[in-house]
């Protein structure tokens, strides 16, 4: 039995509704996508550092909600990494054993995805086919990126994490959020789910969920927004970078103030990538 949490649905549904409004604003407010200011991915952004043109387009309220989600995410990680007595939850450093486990797992998952794509090429066309070929052309580079991981350069710590963190694992409660479903990745073994990992893996999972929500909105409303698909993609990527920046600023500030060792800027960016 679990306690009932009063809620207005999950954050995935909430974000889709928000994204629809944001893309609708492009035409409603006659926004010129090419004129919107750009920003680097993973650049931390306080609210007052977000250009007024972006605030006018996206709306202040969405950035404030993203900040709240970031705060709750950091609080979750601080709680999971604060037990110094129970060894199953004590923070730990990177080591050779973890690196072997990580590389084997990544390469196994990568090969599975590779096989799926190779066996599905005949079903694809258009942009999906182009992206599939692009992925296959870069498979050696991707594999090398995994193999070259060097744990000796990592200064942050690993903890028990959520493990399957995305918008669907979050309930909306007024202006706040509840995080739930801590059982980890469904496709992972119980043993693998217990492996301590960088908390930024959860953060990256949430960012991927932001990205999915943006593109689900574009693809599911193709006839609604009076723009070429490429223009919507450009707006979507820009929106993604600003949401990520607002999330990171709040998350990193709270995590570091709670003595959660997530590393310095270079390591944070490396792990997120």
Model-predicted regions and their roles:
Residues 266-273:
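Amphipathic alpha-helical protein-interaction segments enriched in hydrophobic
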Residues 1-119, 162, 167-169, 173-249, ...:
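Conserved ATP-binding subdomain of kinase catalytic cores across diverse folds
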Residues 113-159:
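An alpha-helical support segment within catalytic cores of ATP-dependent transferases
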